[in-house]
Swiss-Prot record:
It is an enzyme of class 1 (oxidoreductase). GO terms for cellular component: extracellular region. This is Cuticular glutathione peroxidase. Residues 1-19 form the signal peptide. The lineage of its organism: Eukaryota, Metazoa, Ecdysozoa, Nematoda, Chromadorea. Transmembrane segments: none annotated. Belongs to the glutathione peroxidase family. The active site is at residue 74. Its main location: secreted. CDD domains: GSH_Peroxidase. Keywords: Glycoprotein, Oxidoreductase, Peroxidase, Secreted, Signal.
């Protein structure tokens, strides 16, 4: 195969991958789900940074956190463009966004940890995109299945699923499939200033951040 045909075939494959979305939903499911409040918090967990070091989420005490499982080659990837403006508008600096790359949905995050930031800057969303100082991108992890990260196991236990249907089996790169699984890339969990998960949002429940902003404001007003 010539180099030109090889490049073309890779481009076609990439377009097919990017075009894959999770299951379509009706408007009745776009309302965020409220989480069960318990004594356990996200501060009990550690996560891996891009350099391989571990970081305790207790370092985010007294912050409102938006936790997002992200992917570079997803139809929802352009939501990255909304993250920085939302953080810029958060004048008191209370809000932090924590992004966790995951490759479990149609293999839409194939990059290694050391490649992730370059992929975001030069490929998708591209155009020199770099994260705001309060946008933190961590190492890749699994959000579902046998090896789901303890943080995500906790979030799923505390917050009901956003939709009643998980999706198509061939698009989900994990086992076993659970009823409370993260549905697709860019699902979001909103955590209050005490580290308690409060709301869970479907990836489509976004609208350039306007669908989530009222709930962020609500948690920021809390003492």
């Amino acid at each position: 195969m010539s180099a030109q045909l090889l490049i073309l075939s890779h481009m076609v494959l990439l377009q097919l991958i990017v075009a894959q979305l999770g299951p379509k939903i009706g408007k009745q499911f776009l309302k965020p789900k409220q989480c069960e409040i318990t004594n356990q918090t996200v501060y009990d967990f550690q996560v891996q940074m891009l350099n391989g070091a571990q970081k305790s989420l207790a370092e985010y005490r007294n912050k409102v956190l938006l936790i997002v499982n992200v992917a570079t080659y997803c139809a929802y990837t352009m939501q990255y463009r909304d993250f920085n403006p939302i953080l810029e508008s958060n004048s008191n600096g209370t809000l932090n966004i924590l992004g966790f790359p995951c490759n479990q949905f149609y293999l839409q995050e194939p990059a290694e940890n050391h490649e992730l930031l370059s992929g975001l800057k030069y490929v998708r969303p591209g155009h020199g995109w770099e994260p705001h100082k309060n946008m933190h991108i961590f190492g890749k992890l699994e959000v579902n299945g046998e090896n789901d990260h303890p943080l995500y196991k906790f979030l799923k236990e505390r917050c009901p699923p956003t939709v009643p249907v998980i999706g198509k089996r061939h698009q989900l790169i994990y086992d076993p499939i659970g009823t409370n699984d993260v549905i697709w890339n860019f699902e979001k969990f909103l955590v209050d200033k005490k580290g308690r998960p409060r709301y869970r949002f479907h990836p489509e429940n976004w609208v350039q951040g306007t669908a989530v902003k009222p709930y962020i404001d609500e948690l920021e007003r809390e003492i």
